[in-house]
Amino acid sequence: DDNWMNNSFASRERVKMDLFRRFGAIAAAGDRHLAEFCPGGWYLKDPETVKSWCFGLTTVAWRKEDLKKRLARSERLYTGEEAPVINQTGEEGVQQMRAILGLRDLVTNVNVPNLGQIPNLPLGAVVETNAHFSADSVRPVFAGPLPDSIYPLISRVSGIQELIVQAALDRDLEQAFRAFQMDPNMNLSMPDARKLFDEMIENTKKYLGMYFN
């Protein structure tokens, strides 16, 4: 039985319905993404809270095992031990490419710069809205302003994302820390937040050489 209790990627859509009841707007994303977007105490406080909302979390152990299987299969395909099977997977990216090539028209939700389709968010901020795909063209579809009831929740995250992008462009770790400590899921004290941030930077330092030159 492929349900939320034995599939980390499944849910009963309880978070979606709770947000709809509270804010009067239906969310497009699944419960796992919605939960991580909201303040941590709402749906991710502890394992018991997660379980009560009927969705699963992907464990580190699962990620490691999944990567191991993918690498092993890649090796079998490379050596010819396993023959590739060509079929339709349902991946929408294929349909998006077909539309851009002019083989069809498509309207779907994608991450694109805000060109005014959400008027009360900053222009240029990356937003997930519907867009019309056609030959050599991806045009955002007007979505309208965010309702007042959810504007503070989304505008805060949008502002933090702008901050972290600027930190990356400026190679400014202090700016990155400011964004980190303001994340809705950050509920540590300032000293503990700094300690965690510094540990994360230290453990990924080999990938961050440009920040230390």
Regions found by a protein language model. Give the residues of each.
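Long, compositionally biased stretches enriched for glycine and/or charged residues
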Residues: 1-213
